[in-house]
């Protein structure tokens, strides 16, 4: 069996692949003389193919990398730029070589991954400082990778980003986090209180909301993590938890008095045995979450909706009705008036 790292393990591969990963330059010269095209991808298994340069970089074989570059291999392939492969799989000698010969340090691959993310995927943490020192700086480019690293619980990696000036409140949308969370929101939703405290100690803002209005405190309430919720509550402005201030905030929503009274009751959890939802739990009035769907204002009323994690019960002031909001597809369905 032939192990090519995370490209896979193969019972057999073309002989040229062995020559590439072992740096057999004489064999590569001979193959070139016999008409081998160094730009043509090599088939591995039924469904995968890789360029010779990709194979050399993945296997950290500097002699083959050098030989291929000298013979015209493309260092800045749009789908798999050499710099990303080097920082994910290789050592500093290979990284320095491809950069010295024209590799774009700011390149993104076909799925918008940058160098910091590539190094994290490959667990080549020692390459993070190299990337930064080459000019792909943490301050300008590190936010996305930093946010992605939160769920790995690797504090040494997080320290690297923070000490090099990462935007600790980075919240641009991407394919992983389209709902625009900050790293602190990610920590509140997917990690633990220790991580939240770590981020706050390094300047994370507890008041920044996600696209749907959720802030770290709201996320903790949703998760029923009252220790975390109390922690965030002590850090938030006092007016966030003042009833009169909340009522002023909710005036544009024109809530029916009956709905206000309902949300102030003690029991906000209901079993729904004859419904697909199974159960529903509403948020207390002070914890309801205003947000916008496009230009339309909505107020989230539900804490959880049975097994439907992507659905929320909302109040729509435009229709003056209760609605159901599908967060995954960003669709709003009108249900009924509150008293119905």
Task: For each feature predicted by the language model, list its residue ranges.
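Ankyrin-repeat boundary/"N-cap" motif
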Residues: 8-18, 41-54, 76-85, 108-117, ...
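A surface-exposed partner-binding patch
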Residues: 11-12, 211-314
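Ankyrin repeat A-helix N-terminal signature
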Residues: 18-24, 54-61, 85-91, 117-124, ...
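Ankyrin repeat structural motif
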Residues: 24-33, 60-70, 90-100, 123-133, ...
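The conserved C-terminal loop/turn that links adjacent ankyrin repeats
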Residues: 35-39, 72-74, 102-106, 135-138, ...
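A generic tandem-repeat structural signature
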Residues: 56-124
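Solenoidal tandem-repeat scaffolds enriched in leucines and small polar residues
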Residues: 98-166, 174
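Elongated, non-catalytic scaffold/linker segments and compositionally distinctive motifs
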Residues: 146-241
């Amino acid at each position: 069996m032939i192990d090519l790292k995370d490209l896979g393990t193969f019972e057999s591969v073309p002989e040229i692949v062995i020559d590439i990963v072992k740096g057999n330059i004489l064999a590569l010269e001979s193959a070139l003389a016999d008409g081998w095209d160094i730009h043509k991808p090599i088939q591995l298994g039924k469904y995968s193919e890789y360029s010779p340069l990709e194979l050399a970089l993945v296997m950290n074989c500097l002699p083959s990398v050098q030989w291929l570059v000298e013979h015209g291999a493309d260092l800045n392939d749009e789908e798999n730029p050499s710099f990303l492969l080097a920082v994910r799989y290789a050592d500093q000698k290979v990284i320095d070589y491809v950069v010295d010969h024209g590799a774009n340090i700011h390149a993104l691959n076909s799925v918008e991954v940058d160098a910091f993310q590539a190094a994290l995927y490959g667990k080549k943490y020692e390459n993070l400082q190299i990337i930064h020192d080459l000019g792909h700086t943490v301050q300008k480019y590190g936010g996305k990778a930093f946010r992605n690293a939160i769920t790995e619980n690797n504090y040494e990696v997080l320290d690297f980003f923070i000490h090099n000036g990462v935007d600790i409140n980075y919240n641009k949308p991407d394919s992983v986090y389209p709902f625009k969370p900050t790293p602190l929101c990610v920590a509140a939703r997917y990690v633990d209180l220790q991580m939240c405290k770590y981020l706050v100690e390094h300047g994370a803002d507890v008041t920044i909301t996600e696209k749907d209005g959720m802030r770290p405190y709201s996320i903790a309430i949703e998760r029923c993590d009252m220790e975390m919720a109390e922690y965030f509550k002590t850090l938030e402005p006092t007016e966030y938890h003042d009833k009169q201030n909340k009522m002023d905030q909710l005036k544009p929503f024109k809530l029916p008095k009956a709905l206000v009274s309902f949300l102030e009751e003690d029991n906000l959890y209901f079993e729904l045995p004859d419904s697909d939802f199974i159960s529903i739990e509403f948020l207390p009035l002070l914890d309801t979450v205003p947000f916008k769907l496009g230009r339309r204002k909505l107020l989230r009323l539900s804490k959880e909706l049975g097994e439907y994690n992507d659905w929320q019960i909302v109040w729509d002031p435009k229709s003056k009705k209760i609605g159901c909001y599908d967060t995954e597809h960003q669709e709003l369905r009108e249900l009924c008036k509150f008293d119905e």
